[in-house]
Amino acid sequence: MKRTIILMLDSLGIGASADAVRFGDEGANTLGHIAQACVTGNADNGRKGPLTLPNLTRLGLAHACAASCGEFPAGLDASVTPIAAYGYARELSSGKDTPSGHWEMAGAPVLFDWGYFTDKQNSFPPELLDALVAQGNLPGYLGNCHASGTEILDRLGEEHMRSGKPIFYTSADSVFQIACHEETYGLDKLYELCKLARQLLEPYNIGRVIARPFVGSKAGEFKRTGNRHDYAVEPPMPTLLDRMKAAGGDVISIGKIADIYACCGITQQHKATGLDELWDMTLAQVKTAADQSIIFTNFVDFDSSYGHRRDVAGYAAALEYFDSRLPELLALLLPGDRVVLTADHGCDPIWTGTDHTREHVPVIFYGDTVQPQDLGMRDTFADIGQTIAAYHGLPVLDYGSNCLPEHH
């Protein structure tokens, strides 16, 4: 039996990479700064004391962080001997966005520059907006600016409900986001509008169009729902997932994974919202997945609910919850199963602004076929995909080196 379970801890960076200075991220360290805040009592909102991650520490997360940034995360147990192969990887891709991190991990780094809408106000070209209004039969639009997704709902949600005008906004990422009320505007109508935007954005090289449905009746009460949908461009070359699917194996997407890869190489999709549901669905799939399967879960909340919102205590509590569920997974593993833990970028909750941070990510392999060892620094996230491809006997990927060449 050979199955690989990939747990993508979205935004759990473990120290700034050498090129972080290019991004204004020199000194960022998502895990390190959360641990530090916990030890100094600056993350006691709803939780208390030092960061408690016994299972992740046994798997080598803290050791990988120490190797990456030169300092063991405050409050975590440095006396533990890791039971997994652990290391850290730097990013080859030119950006620090979600698709770049995910695609590179699966063997397809993004070596081109995405398009961005850099103007904070009147962010979108008039000809794009005119085409959306005309082809989407819209009464107009709201927003047309950079904004945080929660703040813009408080500002424009009520007007959107009255007027039926969708809210268009962007961020420092290569995204075009559309927020509409699930009930007054309608989910299907929002999805159709996003598909139109995806087509019209082709010449602008924008990575993702994101549907941001919400509910509620007035400012201060609006809440985004779990029906978010991402419309991504396809990866620039075949990925690990395409290789597995082509070989007749299963690629089981949980949460955002299918959206991020534009459904390329996915054989099964399972929706789940929130860390608890994502964990429940992951465990359910591990119980039933066949030989030659990849079960791939994106734990988005670390990034969307805590990293971008710069909520240190929330991020710490979420990590502790994640850690508390790990033993359930380890208890289900069969001989030949491997667990991979990694991240797609950083999003340091003590950093300025609300953007991602350019960081190293953890590279952790665990299973009965994996010799515990220090994997050191990996030159690209693609080493993860190459290692998984080799284990499953798939064709070699264009990028990356096998971290565990002697293990098959």
UniProtKB/Swiss-Prot annotation:
Cofactor(s) needed by this chain: Mn(2+)
Sites where the protein binds Mn(2+) 2: 303, 308, 356
Residue numbers binding Mn(2+) 1: 10, 344-345
InterPro entries tied to this protein: Alkaline_phosphatase_core_sf (IPR017850), DeoB (IPR010045), Metalloenzyme (IPR006124), Phosphopentomutase_DeoB_cap_sf (IPR024052)
Pfam families associated with the record: Metalloenzyme
Gene3D superfamilies in the record: Alkaline Phosphatase, subunit A, Phosphopentomutase
Compartments it resides in: Cytoplasm
Main localization category: cytoplasm
One cellular-component annotation, GO: cytosol
Isomerase keyword on record: yes
GO molecular function: magnesium ion binding; manganese ion binding; phosphopentomutase activity
Keywords: Cytoplasm, Isomerase, Manganese, Metal-binding
EC number per UniProt: 5.4.2.7
Gene Ontology BP terms: 2-deoxyribose 1-phosphate catabolic process; 5-phosphoribose 1-diphosphate biosynthetic process; metabolic compound salvage; nucleotide metabolic process
CDD domains assigned: PPM (cd16009)
Pathway(s) it belongs to: Carbohydrate degradation; 2-deoxy-D-ribose 1-phosphate degradation; D-glyceraldehyde 3-phosphate and acetaldehyde from 2-deoxy-alpha-D-ribose 1-phosphate: step 1/2
Record's function text: Isomerase that catalyzes the conversion of deoxy-ribose 1-phosphate (dRib-1-P) and ribose 1-phosphate (Rib-1-P) to deoxy-ribose 5-phosphate (dRib-5-P) and ribose 5-phosphate (Rib-5-P), respectively.
Protein name, as recorded: Phosphopentomutase
